Amino acid sequence: MAGTSHAVTNTPCQDSCLAQVNLTASGLPILSIFVADGAGSASNGGDGAEIAVEASAQLLADKIKSKEFTLNDELAVELVSHVREQLYALAEEQGLLARDFACTYLGVLATSFGTLVMQIGDGGIVIDVGAGLEVPIVPMSGEYANMTHFVTDEDAISVLITQCYPCKAEKVSVFSD
């Protein structure tokens, strides 16, 4: 849904999201939610957001086929790395810069045995893992006002913040700004 600033400036919504429940190789349901918000300053930010959520869902679908699948920080890094590879390859293919596909990136993966939360940039995640609602990761801002971090930034992996819980999420909300 386009926000009020999109309506005023007559620009399309550049956000993308995906929420689904799949089964792991052992038959365990896994909830996956991915949200990306294309940078307004990026010429193809909306496309970047769309690719980010699609690439994440694709890699996750492959990962959950393994009996050794686990929710951990390494999985978050692998997801972000895969998204970056896809965006950088598309930029090169189109003769553009990866920055042209800049977007924020948020994700939640939840099973009955654990929950993984990950974020680069602004937007927000609110979860309840049994102790009431909480914001597990403070939304990021950049060095100056109205700045944030993007999955295409050179330091994206180092600014990625993750939070792992050893229990299932009772309630989840993931949203862009």
Question: Which residue ranges define each predicted feature?
Answer:
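PP2C/PPM-type serine/threonine phosphatase catalytic domain
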Residues: 1-176
